Amino acid sequence: NGYYTSFMHPNTSTFWNREEVYKKGYNIDEYNDINSFQNIERAGEFYSDEGFFKEAVYLMNSYENKFCTTLVSVTTHIPFYLDGVSNLDEKLTITEEDLSTFENETFRNYLISCNFVDYAFGEFLEELQNAGLMENSILVVYGDHGAGIEANTDLEKLYSENNLEYTQIEDKIKDVHIPFGIKVPNIKDNINIQRSVSKIDIKPTILDLLGIKDNFSLGKSIFTNKDYSFIKGLGFITSENYCINEKIYNRQTLEEIEE
């Protein structure tokens, strides 16, 4: 449909063999890994989303025609270290008092990294706006998987502080929840989709918004009224139930269904 396609990721090309996958498998027009960027600070084992987003806006602003770009950021990936980020304290709103009730170091680092990425993403949106790239663009944001933290004690504290009851099955259900949002030009009212949706629904949803016929997709546009289950690991999820380890739980009551 005439879109210039590009991929950007501040990591090496050998990780998940991304270069081969995107160039030969997806046949994209432009591939960018860490070697394509010049001014990105280290953030522990990875690179800072703040610098990555700035470089991404610079590259996208250089495209002459309409484009479809995929960005994969890494700062909120475990182990959540931010060593190397300049002036970090000035970019955080989370305080030591906020963190004081959590004993698990990994979970504390997770909260700090999320707080930093929240700042970096805000800067990213502002730079997109200043570059004139937001007016006619669909922006899709999603996470690829859960945090991967084994910190049940801290999660219990987090739930209790927000007057929520914590259970192991609820933790399993929430672990499959990832952030997913779409910003569409000229649509001001928020729409909250309550049905079960998955990453395989992203492509058909975008094509639906663009009015492009979808000849084949495993998923469905989230704007359809059809509900269905999808697989997470060895579990099955619908809007009503969650099945894992040969047991079925009601998602509203979190109680096991015996029959």
What is each stretch, according to the model?
Residues 1-259:
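Solvent-exposed soluble domains appended to multi-pass membrane proteins
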